[in-house]
Swiss-Prot record:
A single BP term in Gene Ontology: flower development
Annotated ranges, domain K-box: 90-150
Cellular component, GO, one term: nucleus
Official protein name in the record: Truncated transcription factor CAULIFLOWER A
Alphabetized UniProt keyword annotations: Activator, Coiled coil, Developmental protein, Differentiation, DNA-binding, Flowering, Nucleus, Transcription, Transcription regulation
Subcellular location: Nucleus
Tissue expression: Expressed in some of the meristems of arrest-stage cauliflower heads.
Note: This is a truncated version of CAULIFLOWER that may contribute to the 'cauliflower'-shaped floral meristem (curd). This trait has likely been selected by early farmers during the domestication of modified inflorescence structures.
A Pfam family it matches: K-box
Amino acid sequence: MGRGRVEMKRIENKINRQVTFSKRRAGLLKKAHEISILCDAEVSLIVFSHKGKLFEYSSESCMEKVLERYERYSYAEKQLKAPDSHVNAQTNWSMEYSRLKAKIELWERNQRHYLGEDLESISIKELQNLEQQLDTSLKHIRSRKNQLMH
């Protein structure tokens, strides 16, 4: 016998809400991974918990590349839909502000990762890339230190 349909409304019980979020988040990440494999689609998923914790998934390429591609696409779409070439300056500034704000958030997240913080939300592939970047940086630092010492 199958389960009944769940009524789409906020779960009032905090513990039940957290358990549901955790289970559904795992299912959502799994579905994102499945569609990327089955359909050879480039998939990125960003989820923030009610406490602001980030959970993300990105197929093959890194999240930054996908977000930059999305920004370029969104900007191009908005330019095509503009009625004339003199689009409202306020809209352009708002778009630029949003784009720069997203970039800053990305840099801040990367900085936290470089400092070893907030690593629970990234995949094994991203952890391997991070480790490789840190190894390369450490080699450069040691090389420079050795130059200065001799």
